[in-house]
């Protein structure tokens, strides 16, 4: 389990229209910028083996993703290994992430992980919560 309940960084979600769910090797794929950012975040945290993605009930649309550092793989976690990065998906979040791409986006005002999810039926205005 993660040693801290605080999130790693801010994350938002985007509904991806006109995209069919396609079988992939993993429930979640990472863009090169997401891989690079996770490596940067873990560089100074040798006691942590990766990040864990979870889902919580909150926000104006029902569900929201969480990101935490983790020291180990939980018994029911799904592990995604890509380009030397380990991402663990909590059991409760596994079905909500099928076919999802995890990206890291920076602009002049903000930086955040973005989950491009083809399964989402709706999001709130700020993009932090969603429903499936």
Swiss-Prot record:
Fe cation binds at residues 60, 124, 126. Detected in retina, especially in the retinal ganglion layer, the inner nuclear layer and the outer nuclear layer. Detected in retina visual pigment cells (at protein level). Keywords: Iron, Iron-sulfur, Metal-binding, Mitochondrion, Transit peptide. Its main location: mitochondrion. Residues 1-15 form a transit peptide. The keyword Signal does not apply. Pfam families: Fe-S_biosyn (PF01521). GO terms for biological process: iron-sulfur cluster assembly. It is found in: Mitochondrion. GO terms for molecular function: 2 iron, 2 sulfur cluster binding; metal ion binding. The keyword Iron applies. It comes from the Eukaryota. One of its GO terms (cellular component) is mitochondrion. InterPro entries: Fe-S_cluster_asmbl/transfer (IPR050322), FeS_biogenesis (IPR000361), FeS_cluster_insertion (IPR016092), FeS_cluster_insertion_CS (IPR017870), HesB-like_dom_sf (IPR035903). Homooligomer, forming a rod-shaped structure 24 nm in length that may arise through a double-helical assembly of subunits. Interacts with CRY4; CRY4 seems to be associated with the outside of the rod-shaped homooligomer. Does not interact with CRY1 or CRY2. Belongs to the HesB/IscA family. The native protein appears orange-brown and has absorption maxima at 420 and 330 nm, indicative of bound iron ions. This is Iron-sulfur cluster assembly 1 homolog, mitochondrial. The lineage of its organism: Eukaryota, Metazoa, Chordata, Craniata, Vertebrata.
């Amino acid at each position: 389990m993660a040693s801290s309940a605080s999130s790693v960084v801010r994350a938002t979600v985007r509904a991806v229209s006109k995209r069919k769910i396609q079988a992939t090797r993993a429930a979640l794929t990472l863009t090169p910028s997401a891989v690079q950012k996770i490596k940067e975040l873990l560089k100074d945290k040798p006691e942590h083996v990766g990040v864990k993605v979870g889902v919580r009930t909150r926000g104006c649309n029902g569900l929201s993703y969480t990101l935490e550092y983790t020291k180990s793989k939980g018994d029911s976690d799904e592990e995604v290994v890509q380009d030397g990065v380990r991402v663990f998906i909590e059991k409760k979040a596994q079905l909500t992430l099928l076919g999802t791409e995890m990206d890291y986006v920076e602009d002049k005002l903000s930086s955040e992980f973005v989950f491009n999810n083809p399964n989402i039926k709706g999001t709130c205005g700020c993009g932090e919560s969603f429903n499936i």
